[in-house]
Amino acid sequence: MREKRKYFIAERVLLIKRSKIRELFERASKMEDVISLGIGEPDFDTPKNIKEAAKRALDEGWTHYTPNAGIPELREAVVEYYKKFYGIDIEVENVIITAGAYEGTYLAFESLLERGDEVIIPDPAFVSYAEDAKVAEAKPVRIPLREENNFLPDPNELLEKISKNTRMIVINYPNNPTGATLDKELAKTIADIAEDYNIYILSDEPYEHFIYEDAKHYPMIKFAPENTILANSFSKTFAMTGWRLGFVVAPSQVIKEMTKLHAYVIGNVASFVQIAGIEALRSEESWKAVEEMKKEYNERRKIVVKRLKNMPGIKVKEPKGAFYVFPNISGTGMSSEKFSEWLLEKARVVVIPGTAFGRMGEGYVRISYATSKEKLIEAMNRIEKALEGEK
């Protein structure tokens, strides 16, 4: 279509930066024999019982609107889930069903932040947080996550970042992109800080079931229920990224206000998808599949870490969560972006530059092991060969 006129675009949209991850994927899509270690989604298919539940729901007529906050039975299933897995008591009024954790975090930013508010966001961090803050006309304030501190926030630095304008702290553990996990003591410390300063915690927890070795997950609603907005998703846990199903757990007053915005943004999540969500949470078959996925991820994690440790110019801190490794590549003498571009051209392997997640990501790349062992081994062979050739 030939366009003759210049179109007006809202300034808040123009402020949003295009993801560097997508740019790299587009380049890779034009090349042959590329192995992608960049994708942030499970390579597994959704468990069969969940798919069958969606099919039955369609046949049973679940093709109409639902209550904006979600089908009551699914909200009840979320309540049961937190009691069963964590011993945490919440009410149905504390839950809204969303189009993935993406919408959940968006609703949190839009419902709770105003122009001039400050939101403390880790650096590096998942790409959407800073952009969501801009759309909400809030100011992102970055707090560094350092390798020497296991990619965890320093409580003293957190206190230094808090001002009279601070409205929210964002945390995400198990972490994307670093694979770090949050220990109980630090989780409680962050909760105490939020309560002392009357600040919201937006805790994004979609990788909660993919933790390894001695790591444990502690939902932030356990420590600061009155201050925490917990965003979660079926996408990673049950390999349901394309279904767009998630939820938020928060104080009932916050959920009530979020639901008003949610009603005008999407109305409700597709009804048959919500029925599948009930099956996912309540079926033992679903949880057996999750355990199988976790076992496979752990085996892949070990393969990648072991191989990277023996490569020239690479240092790696062993991650205990999610499905990412965040190796330090500064020993290669290349920047994160240069290394990622070089690796794509030289080895036909996609990794994500750490700077896609913030300034503190310089000197690192994100590697996803959410792909088959065969592809991972071949990718490691290619990376090692390319690095050996640079020595």
UniProtKB/Swiss-Prot annotation:
Q: What does the organism's lineage look like at the top? A: Archaea, Methanobacteriati, Methanobacteriota, Thermococci, Thermococcales
What organism is this sequence from?
Pyrococcus horikoshii (strain ATCC 700860 / DSM 12428 / JCM 9974 / NBRC 100139 / OT-3)
Note whether Transferase occurs among the keywords: yes
| Quaternary structure and partners | Homodimer.
**Residues annotated as binding L-aspartate:** 40, 176, 366
**InterPro entries found in the cross-reference section:** Aminotransferase_I/II_large, AspAT/PAT-like, NHTrfase_class1_PyrdxlP-BS, PyrdxlP-dep_Trfase, PyrdxlP-dep_Trfase_major, PyrdxlP-dep_Trfase_small
GO MF terms here are: L-aspartate:2-oxoglutarate aminotransferase activity; pyridoxal phosphate binding
Q: Which PANTHER family match?
A: ASPARTATE AMINOTRANSFERASE, ASPARTATE AMINOTRANSFERASE-RELATED
Q: What is this protein called?
A: Aspartate aminotransferase
UniProt key word Transferase: yes
